[in-house]
C-alpha cells in the first residue's frame, strides 16, 4: 500500500511562482490553487497511491523559534496574492476528501516525518511530495521523496530513494542533518559553522562520518589550521544547527494511513468552489458538470417564461440560441420553446422580419445561412456585450453569463434554457454597459462591426492556386538544396528538425559554444542561432532551412488547404478574443503573413482580385504613435505630426541632438525602435537587444527620449498611477481593461501589468479607430460604389476589391474615410494603393 503526502506550503509556493498569474472576474488570484491541483493530479497519476493527504504549516512560533530566535528570520512574508488563496486551497482539498494535517507549534516537516514514521511502522510505502530538500533526511526503505522543481511554465520532479540519495550526496540520508549542521541553511537562517561551505562540509563528513566524528578528530592533520579554528569557534552553532535541522517525527497528530485512503469527491461542494474560482476546464476535467443539477439554485433575478410547443408567427422580437447539436432555442416575452435539429432544417423556423437577440451574432448568422433560414435584424449580441464589459475573460458561454448576471444555472446544451437566458440577459447587460460608460463603444463600434465582419467572411479573397503551387514547388527545391548544404557541413545526414540531434551536432561535434540550456539540453531556438550565425557556415544554412520549411508548411501548403470551391479563402475574424480590442483571424491566420523577408513577402502575390478587378490596400501611417501624441498631449510630438515631419527622423534629431537634415539612417532606425518601444513599455535590456547596443546606450536613448518628449513621460507616469488606483485603464472610446496585477507584490508580475496599463489605451484606441474605419468604409462603399467590397483587415490596413475602372475613386474614398474617422489633435493619414495582387497594392 502506498500513501502520498504533499508538503502543502512548499507545493503551493512552487505553484504560485511557477504558474502565470490568473484572476477571476472579481480580481481573486487563483493560479497557486490551479498549479497545486495540476501537481497533485500529476503525482497521483505517476505514483498511483491508495491514500493521499496534505500537511500545512500553521501560523505562529514553533519549538525551533523558541530555541533560536533567528530561526527563519530572514524569510519574506507570504505574498498577499498567495495568502488569499491558502484558505480556499484547504477548502478545495476538503471538498476532495483529502485529509489535512497541521499541528500548532510544529512545522509541516515534522508532521510529514511523523506520517512517514507511522507508515513505515505499518509497512506502508510513503512518498513525500515537496520542493524542499529538508525532507530528504526522512528517506528510508519505506519512505521516498519526490522533489518538485517549478519554473514558469515548467514543473519537473525527481524521485529520491536511498540509492538515488547516496548517488547524489555520497552518504546516507540521515547525514543530511550533519551536513546542514556544518554548512548551515540560509533559507531557514540556520547558522552552521561560519566559513564552512557545502564542499568542505561534504569532505569532512566523507572522512569522519558525522558531526560528532568531526569534533572527535579536530586534531587530525588533514584538517587545515584555519578550518580547525573555524570549527572550534563554531562548535556551539554547529550543534544548535543540528537540532534546528533535525525533523522530529513525534508531532502529536491523530493519523493512521487508512484514514487517508482515497475517497470520492464531494462533487457538489467541489463544483461550487471551481465555479467560484472560474476553473471551467477543471469542472469538465473532474467530471463535475452533472453536479450542477444537484446544486442549490442561486437567487434568481428573473421570472421563468412558460414552455411552449412553438413560437407564434406574429412575435416580432425573440432570442435565438443555436446549440452545438443543431437544436434551436427560441424565447420571447410570453414563452420559450426548442426545435430539434430536424425541425429547424425542415423549415419550421421562420425568423424573417423579426428583431433578434443572438449570442455571438456573427457565428449565429453563418449557422442560419447553413440551415437556409432567412434571419431578421439582430438587435443585441449578449456575447459581444459581455466581451466589452470584461475583455480579459476566457469564458463568454451562456451558462457562465447566466450564473454571473442572472443567478440562473443553465447547461449550454439546453437550447431552450439558453434562449431564455439570452432574453433576460439583454436588459441586464445593456444596463451594465450604460453603467460602465461603454454604451458608445458597443453601439457605435462593436455591434455594427459584427455585420461588417460577417460580410467580409462570406466574401473571402481570391487565391492564385497555380502560382501558389509553383511557389510551393520552388520552396521544396530550395529546402532540398539547403539540406544538401547542411549535410555537407555536418559530414553526414541527420534529422534537422530534431532539437536533440541538432544540438549534438552544433555543440558536441562542431564545438560551438552553448548559448542557452534547457532541461533537455542546449537550446537551438532562433535567438540562439542568431548569436551563432557568424561562428560556422552551417548556422545560416539551418536558419534558411527553418525559414523555408515554415513558409512551405504554413503558407504554401497551409493556404492551399484553405481554398474553397469558389477559389477563395474565407478567414474567420475573431472579435471576442484579445484584451486590447484588436481583431485576430484564424483558419487561416492572415494577420501574420510575412513581410520582413523578400521571400515571405512573395506570398502576397498569391492574393489576387477576381477577373476585371484590382485590390486596393489602404494603410494607416504610424497610427499608434499618433494616438500616443494625442493622448499624452505632447507638444513636440504633435508638432512633428502636424508639420508632416517624419516622426522617426524628428525623434532621432531630439534623442541624438543633431539637426533633422543630419540624421543618419542608423540613427533613424534606432529612433524608430525607441518610438515603438516606448508604446510597448520596452526595457533598456530589450531595446539594447533589438538594436544591438549596450544597455548603457539603450538607457541613455530612453532617457533622452523622455526628456525631450515630456508629455509622454508625464503620461506614462499618470496612466499607470491612475490604473493602479481605479483598477483599470481605458481607451478614448471607453474600452476598459482591468489589471488587478498592478497591486501584485511580485515585481515581475507588477512590471508586466504596468506595461499593459501603459500600452492598452494606445493600442486599444488604435484598434477602436480601425474598427470605426471598417464600418465607415463598408457603408461608404455600399452607398457610392456597390461593386467594391471590403475583404480583409490586417493590423492597420484595409483591403478592398473593386472593378479596375473605379480603382482611383475607391482608393481615394477608402483613404478619406480612414483619415476622417476621428478628430484628434494630430492628423490621421492613410495611404491607399492598388494593383493586380496584394503584393502590388502594398
List where the protein language model places each region.
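Extended two-metal-dependent nuclease catalytic cores across DNA- and RNA-processing enzymes
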Residues: 22-24, 73-250
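Active-site palm subdomain of RNA-directed nucleic acid polymerases
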Residues: 433-445, 449, 769-794, 798
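Conserved RNase H-like, two-metal-ion catalytic cores of nucleic-acid enzymes
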Residues: 3-4, 8, 14-53, 69-70, ...
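Conserved catalytic core of nucleic-acid polymerases
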Residues: 458, 570-571, 575-578, 653-786, ...
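C-terminal polymerase-core module
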Residues: 477-480, 484, 488-540, 707-755, ...
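Active-site-proximal helix-loop-helix substrate-binding element of RNase H-like nuclease domains
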Residues: 152-180, 187, 300, 326-453, ...
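Function-dense linear segments that define catalytic or interfacial modules
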Residues: 331-334, 360, 383-411, 416, ...
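Conserved "right-hand" nucleotidyltransferase catalytic core of DNA-directed polymerases
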Residues: 234-344, 356-361, 418-595, 614, ...
Amino acid at each position: 500500500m502506498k500513501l502520498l503526502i504533499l508538503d502543502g506550503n512548499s507545493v503551493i509556493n512552487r505553484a504560485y511562482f511557477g504558474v502565470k498569474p490568473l484572476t477571476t472576474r472579481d480580481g481573486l488570484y487563483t493560479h497557486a490553487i490551479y498549479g497545486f491541483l495540476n501537481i497533485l493530479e500529476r503525482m497521483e497519476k505517476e505514483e498511483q497511491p491508495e491514500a493521499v493527504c496534505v500537511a500545512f504549516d500553521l501560523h505562529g512560533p514553533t519549538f525551533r523559534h523558541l530555541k533560536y530566535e533567528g530561526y527563519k528570520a530572514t524569510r519574506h512574508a507570504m505574498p498577499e496574492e498567495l495568502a488569499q488563496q491558502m484558505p480556499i486551497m484547504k477548502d478545495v482539498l476538503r471538498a476532495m476528501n483529502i485529509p489535512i494535517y497541521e499541528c500548532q507549534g510544529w512545522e509541516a516537516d515534522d508532521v510529514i516525518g511523523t506520517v512517514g514514521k507511522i507508515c513505515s511502522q505499518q509497512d506502508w510505502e510513503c512518498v513525500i511530495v515537496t520542493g524542499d530538500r529538508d525532507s530528504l533526511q526522512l528517506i528510508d526503505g519505506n519512505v521516498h521523496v519526490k522533489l518538485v522543481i517549478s519554473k514558469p511554465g515548467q514543473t519537473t520532479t525527481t524521485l529520491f530513494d536511498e540509492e538515488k540519495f547516496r548517488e547524489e550526496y555520497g552518504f546516507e540520508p540521515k547525514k543530511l542533518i550533519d551536513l546542514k549542521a556544518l554548512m548551515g541553511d540560509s533559507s531557514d537562517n540556520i547558522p552552521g559553522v561560519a566559513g564552512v561551505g557545502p564542499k568542505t562540509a561534504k569532505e569532512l563528513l566523507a572522512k569522519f562520518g558525522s558531526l560528532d566524528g568531526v569534533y572527535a578528530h579536530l586534531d587530525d592533520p588533514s584538517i587545515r589550521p584555519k578550518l580547525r579554528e573555524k570549527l572550534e569557534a563554531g562548535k556551539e552553532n554547529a550543534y544548535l544547527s543540528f537540532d534546528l535541522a533535525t525533523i522530529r517525527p513525534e508531532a502529536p497528530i491523530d493519523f493512521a494511513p487508512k484514514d487517508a485512503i482515497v475517497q470520492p469527491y464531494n462533487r457538489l461542494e467541489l463544483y461550487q468552489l471551481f465555479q467560484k474560482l472560474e476553473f471551467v476546464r477543471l469542472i469538465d476535467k473532474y467530471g463535475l458538470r452533472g453536479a450542477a443539477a444537484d446544486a442549490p439554485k442561486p437567487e434568481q433575478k428573473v421570472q421563468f417564461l412558460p414552455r411552449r410547443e412553438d413560437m407564434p408567427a406574429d412575435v416580432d422580437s425573440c432570442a435565438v440560441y443555436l446549440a452545438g447539436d443543431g437544436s434551436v432555442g427560441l424565447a420571447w416575452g410570453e414563452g420559450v420553446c426548442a426545435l430539434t435539429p430536424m425541425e429547424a432544417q425542415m423549415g419550421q423556423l421562420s425568423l424573417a422580419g423579426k428583431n433578434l437577440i443572438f449570442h455571438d451574432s456573427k457565428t449565429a448568422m453563418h449557422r442560419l445561412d447553413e440551415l437556409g433560414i432567412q434571419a431578421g435584424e439582430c438587435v443585441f449580441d449578449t456575447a459581444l456585450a459581455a466581451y466589452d464589459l470584461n475583455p480579459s475573460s476566457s469564458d463568454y458561454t451562456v451558462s457562465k453569463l447566466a450564473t454571473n448576471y442572472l443567478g440562473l444555472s443553465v447547461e449550454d446544451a439546453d437550447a431552450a434554457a439558453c434562449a431564455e437566458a439570452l432574453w433576460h440577459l439583454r436588459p441586464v447587460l445593456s444596463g451594465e454597459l450604460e453603467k460602465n460608460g461603454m454604451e458608445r463603444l458597443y453601439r457605435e463600434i462593436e455591434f455594427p462591426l459584427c455585420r461588417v465582419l460577417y460580410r467580409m467572411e462570406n466574401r473571402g479573397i481570391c487565391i492564385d492556386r497555380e502560382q501558389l503551387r509553383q511557389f510551393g514547388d520552388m520552396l521544396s527545391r530550395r529546402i532540398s538544396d539547403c539540406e544538401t548544404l547542411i549535410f555537407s557541413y555536418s559530414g553526414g545526414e541527420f534529422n534537422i528538425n530534431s532539437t536533440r540531434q541538432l544540438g549534438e551536432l552544433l555543440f558536441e561535434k562542431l564545438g560551438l559554444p552553448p548559448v542557452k540550456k534547457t532541461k533537455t539540453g542546449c537550446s537551438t531556438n532562433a535567438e540562439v542561432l542568431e548569436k551563432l550565425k557568424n561562428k560556422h557556415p552551417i548556422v545560416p544554412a539551418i536558419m534558411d532551412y527553418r525559414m523555408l520549411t515554415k513558409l512551405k508548411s504554413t503558407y504554401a501548403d497551409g493556404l492551399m488547404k484553405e481554398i474553397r470551391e469558389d477559389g477563395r479563402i474565407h478567414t474567420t475574424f475573431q472579435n471576442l478574443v484579445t484584451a486590447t480590442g484588436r481583431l485576430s483571424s484564424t483558419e487561416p491566420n492572415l494577420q501574420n503573413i510575412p513581410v520582413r523577408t523578400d521571400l515571405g513577402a512573395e506570398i502576397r502575390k498569391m492574393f489576387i482580385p477576381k477577373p476585371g478587378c484590382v485590390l486596393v490596400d489602404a494603410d494607416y501611417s504610424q497610427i499608434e504613435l499618433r494616438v500616443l501624441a494625442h493622448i499624452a498631449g505632447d507638444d513636440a510630438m504633435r508638432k512633428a505630426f502636424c508639420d508632416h515631419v517624419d516622426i522617426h527622423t524628428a525623434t532621432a534629431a531630439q534623442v541624438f541632438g543633431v539637426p533633422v537634415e543630419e540624421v543618419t539612417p542608423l540613427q533613424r532606425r534606432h529612433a524608430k525602435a525607441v518610438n515603438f518601444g516606448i508604446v510597448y513599455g520596452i526595457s533598456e535590456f530589450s531595446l539594447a537587444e533589438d538594436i544591438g547596443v549596450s544597455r548603457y546606450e539603450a538607457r541613455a536613448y530612453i532617457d533622452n527620449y523622455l526628456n525631450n518628449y515630456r508629455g509622454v513621460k508625464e503620461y506614462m507616469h499618470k496612466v499607470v498611477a491612475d490604473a493602479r488606483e481605479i483598477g483599470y485603464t481605458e481607451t478614448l472610446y471607453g474600452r476598459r481593461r482591468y489589471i488587478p496585477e498592478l497591486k501584485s507584490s511580485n515585481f515581475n508580475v507588477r512590471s508586466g501589468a504596468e506595461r499593459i496599463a501603459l500600452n492598452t489605451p494606445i493600442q486599444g484606441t488604435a484598434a477602436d479607430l480601425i474598427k470605426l474605419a471598417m464600418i465607415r468604409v463598408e457603408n461608404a462603399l455600399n452607398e457610392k460604389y456597390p461593386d467594391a467590397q471590403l475583404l480583409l483587415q490586417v493590423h492597420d490596413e484595409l483591403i478592398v476589391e473593386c472593378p479596375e475602372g473605379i480603382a482611383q475613386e475607391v482608393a481615394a474614398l477608402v483613404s478619406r474615410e480612414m483619415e476622417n474617422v476621428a478628430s484628434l489633435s494630430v492628423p490621421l493619414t492613410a495611404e491607399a494603393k492598388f494593383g493586380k495582387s496584394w503584393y502590388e497594392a502594398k
